[in-house]
Amino acid sequence: VSLVVSMSAFAQAIKVEIVKKEDGGYQLLRDSEPYIIRGAGVDGADLEELTSYGANSIRTWSIDGGVYPAAEILDKAHSLGMTVSLGLDFARERLGFDYNDKEAVAKQFEEAKANVLKYKDHPALLTWFIGNELNFDFTDPAVYDAVNDVAKMIKEIDPNHPVTTTIAGFDKKAMKAIQDRAPALDFISFQLYADVVNLPKYIKNFPYTGPYMITEWGAVGHWEVYNTKWGAPVETTSSEKASNYAKSYLQAIQSQSSQVIGNYVFLWGQKQERTSTWYGMFLKSGERTEAVDVMQYIWTGQWPDNRTPRVSAIGLDGKVAFDDVYLFTDETYSAMLNVADPDQDKVTFRWEIRKESTATEVGGDREYEPPVIEGLIEDPSSQEVTFQAPSEAGAYRLFAYVLDGNGNAAHANFPFFVK
């Protein structure tokens, strides 16, 4: 019989606090020392690999709703010298929860309290995140009364860890509700993608003068790009994504260090959200993309010894995705992808065609990935491919992947419509 006991059962909490500096800015302290978060949002990621790239902190979205339970994540993080901003899942109004239902709100409060009591003394704990993007499609500001009640409770039983909630975008209505109804929060957390470069302007104009984190940032969001005439979002390539990571960090985080007390890049892992490559920094098969190179440089000042391939957009019979390309059933077409490998590695290619996702979920809710349609591409391992348009009319997407044999990859895709 083996007995597994979480560190939180006997460990000593490490005090974390936010202090105001002489210059008017803010500083996160851990154990009385300045703590610079080099963070990533994870769900099921290899934390040892993450630390090897220079990260020192992770954030989660729930206690036990992810791949690994909180106790396991905290213990693993602690063994690696990492910290965890722990998510307390909160029900969302857009999914049917009523924040005027006192019984349901009280039940949620007690669940949060039980989790706080369970994990508050874990040495890897850094901050508490109450809910995620509770402002998404919200109409009832009472949600922030519930957030405040939990924040007050946490401060009473756990004075060692600051408390926040995360906001999708820069939402003035949510900001007003938080200021009016949730004064117990220690800081606010924002989650923006392409628009993150405008966050300093939004903060200044609102105005908000307190400390904040940016707890999701990275790729350009699927709602922020050009849509084809049939409504398919045009995804950036892995190289374009990497450039956006660098730009976002420089303009929204590094330049705003007086108010930004930390950040968590999204997503150290992979997920299906409109496509399987849109937000993850890894492919489903595990290969690293160029965004990982950028994050290692941001975290350590050093590029990896072996870099990822770089790609440009797919060309389909001389056209690009912004051309709203229509194909005819069963007709033959060609596509190609230009690639450059910084290390002159021998690269291999993989192409596939899938139906366009019909997902309409918002806020990161789970989505179904359409399967690969086999037999349409003549030689899916070539740099330039010939393929047959599907025999069924509708929206599709052509995907291309480039692998360098060293665990690195690049990707691009091209939406098209068959008629």
Language model feature labels by segment:
Residues A412-V418:
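C-terminal edge beta-strand
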Residues V1-S6:
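Bacterial N-terminal signal peptides
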Residues Q388-A393, N406:
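Short, surface-exposed loop/turn segments at beta-strand-coil junctions that are enriched for proline
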